[in-house]
Amino acid sequence: MTLQDRFSLAGQAALVTGGAKGIGAAISATLAEAGATVTIADLDTVEGEALAGRLGGHFIRLDVTDFDACAAVAQRITPDVLVANAGIVHNAPTKEVDPSDWRRVIDVNLSGVFNTLRAFGPAMVARGSGACVCTSSMCGEVSVWPQPQAAYNAAKAGVNLLVKSTAVEWARSGVRVNAIAPGYTATELTLAGRSKPEWFEVWMDRTPMGRLGEPREIADSVLFLCSAAASFITGTVLTVDGGYTAL
């Protein structure tokens, strides 16, 4: 197998939750460029259908917090590559977080990943092959400052252990499960922080490379984990943060 072949996804079916915008859109585009037929599963019908059309893929409207909805889609699609990327952010001090906001963040960012793995994983395991990548965050490894976001951080830390646990369970079935942990990236989710100099200056001061990541850089790392080039990698959280967590 050539180097190009090891990174190719030709002939494979990929499903990307939260794949319509931001990092998810970059992942969808990168997997398609690598040869996969991509199904974008997202709540944003307008952006999702438009991107799927450009990529020659498919769009499904999906709420990852609804397990039954995930299971219904899984009855129709058994992907070779599964990317659980859907996520939201919420900034509030712990002593002020409304319990409903806490539950919403956990429901999307942690339970949504579980629902995705639980719905699509069994058929992949039964088939004996597949690659799953879940979007975590450097915030699942370290607390960040100055923005308060305990719910987000807790959810992403949960994703890391969910990935490791599931990877161990599925390792001998031929299904690999890994996570990507982006640092500060130039997407809509970081727009609020980037517009606040008192936050953004701290972000850049504490990022050794001194810049934001680009969605494409995160997507390229996802492609690696999905590809045959990562065939002996499972249960890993790959941090792509410009050196933030190295300090």
Locate the predicted segments by residue:
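Substrate-binding pocket helix/loop in short-chain dehydrogenase/reductase
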Residues: 93-94, 98-106, 199, 203
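Active-site helix of classical SDR
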Residues: 117, 155, 163
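Residue(s) in the substrate-gating loop at a strand-loop-helix junction
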Residues: 137
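Short, small/polar-rich loop/turn modules that mediate ligand/substrate recognition or access, typified
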Residues: 171, 176, 233-235
